[in-house]
């Protein structure tokens, strides 16, 4: 399970970094595929034990990657900016368990960020667990992660 947590964190980090990338960065479909695969692997890991659990991870990752790629292909730059701004606001000041919503009025895509448990990591940084849910073209995708507050006040996915 620790390996899966690391994979999930890396996938979320790649996604958040994508929001800052210029034209040479990963495209939105690639980001969706990465996030979907990681989310599917996490979900698949909840089933079975031993080799059965590995099969669950593999199947979940594959199905999640396909669905995530389709959703990512439909998520535009404005969607990603709205998600990033909402994530920062939710992690900084929203009470645990509250949904902080975003909506792109141009295409109807929307979602919400739900901050959860707040804790201090081994270096003393404030960190939060969170859930991000997006609905793109009527299809919902949910990811889970941890982020820590940086000295400049920005929240960054924990690695």
Curated annotation (Swiss-Prot):
Q: Show the InterPro entries listed in the entry.
A: Anti_2, Gly_zipper_2TM_dom, Surface_antigen_Rickettsia
Parts of the chain that traverse the membrane: none
Tell whether Signal is among the UniProt keywords. Answer: yes
Supply the alphabetized keyword list. Cell outer membrane, Lipoprotein, Membrane, Palmitate, Signal
Instruction: List localization entries.
Output: Cell outer membrane
Spell out the protein name for this chain.
17 kDa surface antigen
Q: Which gene encodes it?
A: omp
Which family does the UniProt entry place this protein in?
Answer: Belongs to the rickettsiale 17 kDa surface antigen family.
- What membrane topology does the annotation report for this chain? Lipid-anchor
Major site of localization recorded for this protein: membrane
Q: Give the species this sequence originates from.
A: Rickettsia typhi (strain ATCC VR-144 / Wilmington)
* Cellular component, GO annotation: cell outer membrane
Pfam name, any one: 17kDa_Anti_2
């Amino acid at each position: 399970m620790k390996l899966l947590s690391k994979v999930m964190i890396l996938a979320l980090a790649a996604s958040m970094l994508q929001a800052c990338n210029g034209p040479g960065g990963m495209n939105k479909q690639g980001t969706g595929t990465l996030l979907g695969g990681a989310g599917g692997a996490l979900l698949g890991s909840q089933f079975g034990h031993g080799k059965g659990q590995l099969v669950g991870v593999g199947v979940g990752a594959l199905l999640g990657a396909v669905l995530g790629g389709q959703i990512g292909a439909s998520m535009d730059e404005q969607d990603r900016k709205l998600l990033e701004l909402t994530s920062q606001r939710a992690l900084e000041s929203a009470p645990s368990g509250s949904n902080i919503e975003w909506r792109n009025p141009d295409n109807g895509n929307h979602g919400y960020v739900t901050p959860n448990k707040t804790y201090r990591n081994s270096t003393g940084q404030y960190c939060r667990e969170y859930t991000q849910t997006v609905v793109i073209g009527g299809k919902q995708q949910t990811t889970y992660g941890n982020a820590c507050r940086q000295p400049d006040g920005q929240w960054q996915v924990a690695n």
